[in-house]
UniProtKB/Swiss-Prot annotation:
Keywords attached to this entry: Signal
Annotated Pfam families: UPF0164 (PF03687)
Origin species: Treponema pallidum (strain Nichols)
Classification via InterPro entries: UPF0164 (IPR005362)
Name of the featured protein: UPF0164 protein TP_0859/TP_0860
Keyword Signal on entry: yes
Family designation: Belongs to the UPF0164 family.
Signal peptide: 1-44
Amino acid sequence: MVRRPCVSAAPVRVGGRLVFGFARVGSRGLCLGALLLSPRIVLAQHVADAPLGARGVVPRSSLPRRTRAARATTLRSRGGVVSSRASGGTLVVTAQKPKVMARNDVDYRPLSLQAGGRQGSLDLVATATADDASFFEANAAGSATIPRMTLAFFHTMRISDSHIDVLSFVGRAGRTGYGVSARAFYPDMSSKTTGFVGIFNVSHAFSSAYRFKGVSVGANLKVGYRHTRGGGSSQSKSSNGKENHHIVLTADVGVRGAWTVSKNFGAHEPNLWAGVAFRNIGASINATNLHGNNGAGGSGGGGGGNGDGKPAHVTDSRVILALAYQPVRYFLFGAGLEWLYNVGSIKAVNSLRYGAAFMLFPLRQLAFSSSVVMKGMGPQQVRASAGAEVQFSHVRCTASYSYLWSATPTRPHYVSIGVAGFLKPVPEQPLWQEVYRSYLRGLRHYHAQRYAEAIAEWKRTLQQGVSFEPAREGIERATKLLQLNQKVHDFNIF
């Protein structure tokens, strides 16, 4: 069989790009010429004298199978992806750029180590309640409303993976709360990541009233250290197999409001809470890179773990919104929303978590809690938790279990136990103690039908506590009854 030489080398415009097309010769083979070099290489081929094969398939090249496999392997090794398609009588072969993969996420557990307690079972809703010693990672404003000075210890275990130990102290002086917490993370295998976090907290409560219990604002300063050894898990070891040392400096800011709204049990405590928390605002410093050894990147930040060799990275941050409501003494429920983001790589780190939780109080000394939190619209992850607590006069014991379902294989079981000791109650402010005493004196006059004396006493109550609404309501009722008695007295005279 005689093969004709290539005869047509006219330029062809394909998709707005000028390339060189060559006529096909015979039923097999291509005459290839110079191609226009670009990120996408398009090879156009006229098939006027050689139509597509049977079933619309372009006949395969006559190159041996080994040669075709070797060329494909070479192209893949250079980062190219080859695809071909036949459309409109034209065979288009495309060499695409490799996709830019998202950053290699690293498990930054030393930055956000849950303490167990009520946070372990309520999860996102703990940002609204924040009423025990586990508030540090839930809402930094929690220490301003802690009723008693507390010393607590929590141990959380991810079965067959790692452990977290937490020691926390919380106190309050008037409207100002303070606390410190030390947290250590260590795995079951010594070849993986270890780390610790120290948290220093301060908060203050403003505008406390009778129904509106006020708003508290707090902040955490967090100092963390992370040590990564080569040979650990693929998500925690350095890319070069050497040790990496990371120092993390972050801050948390929290706001929490409390109200008394539509409850059927008589108590001065609030029954509606709302909280917002901004967590892990700061940077991670790769101390290994500072000494000239470029490791796996910064721990805990956008670009961390991507091997860019930068000494510092912005940490992954979170914004949490939560609401909790207790309509009756025996039941509390709430919902929360969390946005995980990174200002340095907003596209690579951008996800939502959302969930709900509830608590049951069958007895004053016993409580049960549970929550379900999902990640993504899929969802990509589902975390279900359940816990219980028993409280005595000066001690509270807690236990919780969490199951984490994920689209990727993981160790799903978490168990947490804790004990909190109440050292001494925080004394109430003398001003509010006098307000309550004055209000009670007015009630005694009211029940004795001495309405004028009750009104006078409640006016003194409002002078000491302007926002004490029961005294204002008592004055209105006593005034109406006093006017009614005066009318009855005038009627009897006539």
